[in-house]
Structures are given as C-alpha cells and as structure tokens.
A protein has these predicted regions:
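Sec-dependent signal peptide recognition
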Residues: 1-7
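Hydrophobic h-region of N-terminal signal peptides that target proteins for export
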Residues: 8-17
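Contiguous segments within soluble domain cores/interaction surfaces
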Residues: 18-141
Length: 141
C-alpha cells in the first residue's frame, strides 16, 4: 500500500502545469518573447461603440520573471489611430495563484472600439526586467 502511495505522489509531481488561460473559457493567446497573455472579452462578442472588458492572465515563459503589471490598449493599423478610451487594469480575484507564481490574473475595464475593422490588442507586460508587448489582432464587423 505504501508503494502505491509513493508512486502516486511521484506521478503527481510530474503532472504538466495547466496551460496559460486554462481557467478562462474561450481565451485566445497574445504572445511576446517572454510572455503569453491568455485573454477573453466580456461580453464575448464585441459590438461597435459599446464598452467591454478584457479578462486575462499573463504567463511567464521559461525563466522570465513574473509580471508586475500590465497596460492594455488597442490600435487600428490601417487607420493609424487607437481607442478614444483608456482601459483601467486591476488585479483579478486570485491574481497570483500560489501554485503558479509566474501567472498573474487581471481585468481591464472601459475599452471601446468606435468603428469596425482590424484592431490590434496591445498587452504591455511589465516585470523586473522591463516591459514587453504581446499583441493579437481581431476583426470587428
């Protein structure tokens, strides 16, 4: 019986970590050199001219330090302009899971896309080693 318990303990210590954003149903990934940002919008379907929020996790890759904060913005590359509103980013509940110290959870409120077209989400991830931008494009119809 002890052997089975020891084997189970050893096997559980090699279990893979949950993927970045594993708790965010429907999340998509933005990526930089040292970070993944898994995010989803609330509501899930963004409407032109309506405020929305972004729930997200930052996940450090390899030996990169954990994020200490994030700024969220969006830009329309074809039009050369960004949003007319500035997002307010706050740590989310359970912002630093004890079992995953290189993951941090946030919520950004007050975003609005004022016209249809391609928008690039910008996640500027701050850490002890500097700031990196993770990007992801979405098309709003």
């Amino acid at each position: 019986m002890r052997i089975i318990g020891v084997l189970m303990l050893v096997a559980s210590s090699f279990a893979p970590a949950a993927p970045c954003g594993g708790d965010l149903r429907g999340a998509v990934i933005a990526e930089s050199a040292n970070y993944l940002v898994a995010f989803r919008t609330q509501p899930p379907r963004i409407a032109v001219g309506k405020h929305f929020s972004v729930e997200f996790e930052t996940c450090a890759k390899g030996d990169a330090p954990a994020s200490t904060g994030v700024a969220v913005d969006a830009f329309m590359p074809e039009h050369g302009h960004g949003m007319n509103y500035r997002a307010v980013v706050k740590p989310a509940a359970g912002a630093k899971p004890a079992d995953a110290p290189t993951i941090a959870r946030y919520r950004a409120d007050g975003l609005m896309f004022h016209m249809p077209g391609r928008w690039d989400f910008y996640f500027d991830v701050r850490s002890a080693s500097g700031t990196e931008r993770a990007t992801r494009s979405v098309v709003l119809e």
